[in-house]
């Protein structure tokens, strides 16, 4: 039986095919992305540079001599490669288990194409089993938590974690996310919320799943 890490590697290696040469690209954060950076580094493909969404990804890119640039230095990105904690048939996602979802949304929105890579366990019919991360300013944490509770969720402060921007993460369990786009917007309207981990407005254009049968390329609502 193929291990989860092996499935992640299968998806990551396939994703290298979606990277155009001599372009700037965006790189996400997480264990699957670590496999992708390794595969890209070993592929011999030449890119102008990569915008990283986290320090860890940036350090790994540098290890493979892939130039790391700031989003402010480029006019746009050809493709954004990132993983997901959950992804549905419309390629809407929950992301942010690593706490970098604000940066990830910024870079995704600057990219012409979003390629999501994941092992097959992340492909779900409905979002919400994975806790939804919500980034909030510290002074509004209690207010934000009460609002999320009123929406039907069970908020839990991520203890001992501070985001890149110095904010806190509230992980919300048990939300009914039947309409991801609406839920994403409603949560972001709460005063004190910087961003939440629903990627419906910035859904993926392509999903590459690592499966027991190999890499499977999926487009929105293909099923």
Swiss-Prot record:
One of its GO terms (cellular component) is cytosol. Its EC number is 5.3.1.6. It catalyses: aldehydo-D-ribose 5-phosphate = D-ribulose 5-phosphate. The active site is at 104 (proton acceptor). Keywords: Isomerase. SUPFAM superfamilies: D-ribose-5-phosphate isomerase (RpiA), lid domain, NagB/RpiA/CoA transferase-like. GO terms for molecular function: ribose-5-phosphate isomerase activity. InterPro entries: NagB/RpiA_transferase-like, Ribose5P_isomerase_typA_subgr, Ribose5P_isomerase_type_A. It comes from the Bacteria. It is an enzyme of class 5 (isomerase). Pathway: Carbohydrate degradation; pentose phosphate pathway; D-ribose 5-phosphate from D-ribulose 5-phosphate (non-oxidative stage): step 1/1. HAMAP family: Rib_5P_isom_A (MF_00170). Belongs to the ribose 5-phosphate isomerase family. Catalyzes the reversible conversion of ribose-5-phosphate to ribulose 5-phosphate. This is Ribose-5-phosphate isomerase A. It comes from Neisseria gonorrhoeae (strain NCCP11945).
